[in-house]
Regions:
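Cytosolic nucleotide-utilizing catalytic cores of signal-transduction proteins
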Residues: 1-218
Length: 218
């Protein structure tokens, strides 16, 4: 059923397509020359039609896979990381292979043990100490749920956009750099993802302790 769905939806959207099913997944290779925004719109449309048809599933989009080894590596990463990706970006309906690779890298950090994990989360106390404001939780939503958009973050947190802007400014004041500054933002983004993988749901708690990773089994 899923394979027929993909053929019907994508068959007329590209010059060539090869699709088949493997272990419950549908894999499609497209000769696609459209723009990035067109591909993203197509992904959203595919998700909408999946939901309308009563089919469960997520999309993984990958480009620039030059060899069969690249395809195999990407597919195995996708299979291994789907559950973790949904914990990092809950509610998301489609992912890129780059997001799946990032998810795999986060899992590798956790598997290295408590010391490595705590080092990657060392930023947390600086955002929690001396405040009851949910600075780190706001940052998680800003990065992982709202695509670094102040207005979308405000919508998700049910607060005014200026409130989010103030909180982000407080984060930057405490850390000494802008949250969109590279490479610093990479560490912040990773810390947000790790906290979600560790299952800490109360991100706004004002204590200055790091998440307890001593009993965590990857």
């Amino acid at each position: 059923e899923g394979l027929d769905f993909v053929h019907n939806l994508l068959g007329g959207r590209c010059s060539r397509m090869v699709a088949d099913s493997s272990e419950g997944d549908v894999v499609a290779f497209l000769a696609w020359k459209g723009r990035l925004d067109e591909m993203q719109d197509l992904a959203e449309e595919c998700c909408d039609r999946l939901a309308a048809a009563g089919l469960d599933g997520w999309l993984i989009l990958g480009q620039n896979l030059a060899t069969t080894a690249d395809v195999r590596r990407g597919y195995l990463t996708m299979c291994a990381c789907q559950a973790d990706a949904l914990r990092i970006w809950p509610g998301r309906r489609w992912f890129s292979l780059e997001q799946m690779a990032f998810t795999a890298a986060c899992r590798e950090i956790l598997e290295k043990g408590e010391a490595e994990t705590q080092q990657r989360l060392a930023v947390l106390p600086w955002l929690r100490e001396g405040t009851e404001t949910d600075l780190f939780g706001t940052l998680c939503v800003y990065y992982l749920d709202a695509g670094s958009s102040l207005s979308k973050t405000a919508e998700q947190l049910y607060v005014h956009k200026n409130t989010v802007k103030y909180r982000i400014q407080q984060v930057e004041q405490r850390l000494g750099y802008r949250v969109d500054q590279q490479p610093e933002a990479i560490e912040l983004y990773t810390a947000c993802a790790l906290v979600r993988l560790l299952g800490e749901t109360t991100l706004g708690q004002s204590d200055n302790a790091l998440p307890d990773t001593s009993d965590f089994t990857p």
